[in-house]
Amino acid sequence: MQIGLCLPHFGRHLETGRLLEVARRADTLGFDSIWVTDHVIVPKDVYIAYREEMLDPLAVLPWLAGVTERILLGTSVIILPYRSPLPVAKLLASVDVLSGGRLIFGAGVGWMEGEFAALGVPFKERGSLTDEALELIQKVWTTREPEIDTKRHRLHGLSASPMPLQHPRPPIWIGGASEGAYRRVARYGDGWHSTAATPEAFRQGADAVRRFWAEAGRPGAPVLSLRIPFWLDEIHRPGSDMGYLRGRPAIHGTTRQVIDALRGFAALGVTHVALDVSLTTYPAILEELDVLAREVRPALGG
């Protein structure tokens, strides 16, 4: 199992020096990936962490490319209906080039209805907007002079650049826990990026993804990944921030309990996990990274 972490580029951890230390330490310690989170403008009634200041992930991502050397750079996830897909494709392709081919593109439809209203994006059209964006992004990433007609875009006689460094393109992992999301994995993606699932919920989602993948005639198997809140009880027990969870699953406990929980997900097919460390303090994050690198990753074959 490959282990990554979600960079806490929001809330109380929003300090450049801290983000730099976390990113470079993860890179140096051998973590497999580091992930950014997407929200633009957040209603007051949603999770406490998202009401605090948050840097734009599409600004953080190229910064990460410049301050790290080997760690993979992922988006967990870019909410595609919020932005025009062609500038997003160009920016992400540029990040892939500048990082030496380290991009993982996680994409989703979004869920925060008030955020859609603020941005003037029809909430009920988010599925079709996402599908069209994925079709366009794949096309401009793999074809120098793409020819494509969609509901909202016409590309003829145009040149797309830069091409991503990865061939044929960076991996695309689709987020979400609905039938539409599972079908989207089979149609447009290379893998499923699940969020804060119980083992049983993950198993059900993974079974659906595999079924639609086979029905679509896709070769091989989809990548199965998981983003989930994490902390080590012996280092820090979150207090007031537990409101962020709102009953969502998390991986926590002793080091041995965390290893066992991750092994349980590995048995369900998870090959990549992105641990959300934002619930703990900054000193605790640094200490947890050391424990993960020293004890957890080796136990999981990392």
Which residue stretches match the model-derived regions?
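Active-site-adjacent structural elements that line small-molecule/cofactor binding pockets in enzymes
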Residues: 1-302
